[in-house]
Structure formats: structure tokens, C-alpha cells
């Protein structure tokens, strides 16, 4: 996270860290005792999930480790672009109980509105020019923008005219998610609305906001998978 501050230790009980070997490479969000929602591009062979973590170096007493029991992707018949359906549900190998630093974040009850102030967080890079990673998660407030603001700066991607992605950032630059924040939550007006998906490099440039998978559009799929209907289809 660029341009943010260390998160309050009590404000991110739902935030999980995805590790492969000993490297923290993505974030995710605990949505109930057994399920984590993250980005599809965070899929790796040997994922370890740390819950209830704040500092990488000083563990919380209630920190927990899990591994995926099952992973589900939102597959569509369309060609799978990086920015399309960047969502993955992970079922944990055993449930976690709520504790001082662990509690799920509920799914959104209404769609987000452009102009909302949103909070995002993660252990990703805190410098857009240097590979500086923090020991603690950083949090930042950014604005929910019109989707076109994410489409216009990237003509080379030939992005579709409408999309199940949200666009969020600060037009003057300086605040953004960055490498290592993928899969983490975007929380707008207290509701879990987005999953960090992609952005430009270097991060936090003016007029180069980032894209977040729109959780609200995938609610039916999420609820179906959790209910055991594993051949649930994705929104078109």
C-alpha cells in the first residue's frame, strides 16, 4: 500500500496473508469460519494461509495457520483475461474460531456507489520506486471512481466497455495498492466491495487508478459454492 499508514491492529481481523514457502505474496479476506476470498491470480501450488497476523516478525498469540482444502474459480466460456473474473474462493482445511485478531467480514448487502471513500490494506510494497515491504499491514483511503477512469489510461489492454471490476484510487496519485496487496479487500462505506486485482507499475501514478474485482456481482456464485453447489456458474 502506497501513501498509507500502519493499520490499527484491531481493524483488520478479516485480513489474511497468503504465503508460498516463506514469502508473503498476496492478501485475502476471511468471509466465514471456513472460507477465504482472494484473487484468482494469487493461485499458487503451495499456499499457506496466516490468519490473525499483524507483524510478520512478532506473532499475535491467536495467530492461526491453514492450508487450502479446496479452491474454486469463477470460470466463464469467454477467454480468461487477467481482468476478467479475478476471483478465487479457498476452503480452509479446518475452520477458524473468532478471536482477538480473527473475525470474518460479511459480504456486501448493496452495490457500491461511485464517489464512496474506500479503505484498502495489505503487506504489499510501500514505495512505488523501491522494493520496500513493511512488517505490518498498511491501510489507505482511496475513492471509488467511474470504471472508465481505469479503462482510458490503458488502451493497450483493450478493456471491455463494461466490466465486473471496480476502479479505485486517487486521481492526483500517491495512494494506491501495490505489488503484494493483490487479493486483499476494498471496503467502501463499511462494506466489502472489491478484491485487489491489477494496476499499473509503478504504483500510485496520477490518473492511473487500479482495478478491483466487484464482489457484489459474484455473490450468487460465492453463496452457491459455499452451500456446496460446486458447479455454480459465474456471472456472464
Curated annotation (Swiss-Prot):
Cellular location(s): Secreted
Keyword Protease among record annotations: yes
The organism of origin for this protein: Gloydius halys (Chinese water mocassin)
Keywords: Disulfide bond, Hemostasis impairing toxin, Hydrolase, Protease, Secreted, Serine protease, Toxin
SUPFAM superfamilies named in the record: Trypsin-like serine proteases (SSF50494)
Stated family: Belongs to the peptidase S1 family. Snake venom subfamily.
GO cellular component terms, A-Z: extracellular region; secretory granule
InterPro entries per record: Peptidase_S1_PA, Peptidase_S1_PA_chymotrypsin, Peptidase_S1A, Trypsin_dom, TRYPSIN_HIS, TRYPSIN_SER
Domain Peptidase S1 stretches: 1-227
Name of the protein described by the UniProt record: Snake venom serine protease pallase
Active-site positions on this chain: 41, 86, 182
Disulfide bridge partners, by residue number: 7-139, 26-42, 74-234, 118-188, 150-167, 178-203
A Pfam family reported for this protein in Swiss-Prot or TrEMBL: Trypsin
Function: Snake venom serine protease that may act in the hemostasis system of the prey.
Tissues expressing the protein: Expressed by the venom gland.
UniProt xrefs under PROSITE patterns: TRYPSIN_DOM, TRYPSIN_HIS, TRYPSIN_SER
Amino acid at each position: 500500500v502506497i501513501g498509507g499508514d500502519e493499520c490499527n491492529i484491531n481493524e483488520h481481523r478479516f485480513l489474511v496473508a497468503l504465503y508460498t514457502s516463506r514469502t508473503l505474496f498476496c492478501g485475502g479476506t476471511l468471509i466465514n469460519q471456513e472460507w477465504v476470498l482472494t484473487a484468482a491470480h494469487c493461485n499458487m501450488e503451495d499456499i499457506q494461509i496466516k490468519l490473525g497476523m499483524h507483524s510478520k516478525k512478532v506473532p499475535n498469540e491467536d495467530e492461526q495457520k491453514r492450508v487450502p482444502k479446496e479452491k474454486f474459480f469463477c470460470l466463464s466460456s469467454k477467454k480468461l483475461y487477467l481482468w476478467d473474473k479475478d476471483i478465487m474462493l479457498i476452503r480452509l482445511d479446518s475452520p477458524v474460531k473468532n478471536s482477538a485478531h480473527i473475525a470474518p467480514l460479511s459480504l456486501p448487502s448493496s452495490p457500491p456507489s461511485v464517489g464512496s471513500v474506500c479503505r484498502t490494506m495489505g503487506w504489499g510494497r510501500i514505495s512505488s520506486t523501491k522494493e520496500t515491504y513493511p512488517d505490518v499491514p498498511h491501510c489507505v483511503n482511496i475513492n471509488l471512481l467511474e470504471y472508465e477512469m481505469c479503462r482510458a489510461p490503458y488502451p493497450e489492454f483493450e478493456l471491455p466497455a463494461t466490466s465486473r471490476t471496480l476502479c479505485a484510487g486517487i486521481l492526483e496519485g500517491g495512494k494506491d495498492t501495490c505489488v503484494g496487496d493483490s487479493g486483499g479487500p476494498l471496503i467502501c462505506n463499511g462494506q466489502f466491495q472489491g478484491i485487489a486485482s491489477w494496476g499499473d507499475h509503478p504504483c500510485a501514478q496520477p490518473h492511473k487508478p487500479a482495478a478491483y474485482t466487484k464482489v457484489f456481482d459474484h455473490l450468487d456464485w460465492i453463496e452457491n459454492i459455499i452451500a456446496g453447489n460446486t458447479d455454480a456458474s459465474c456471472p456472464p
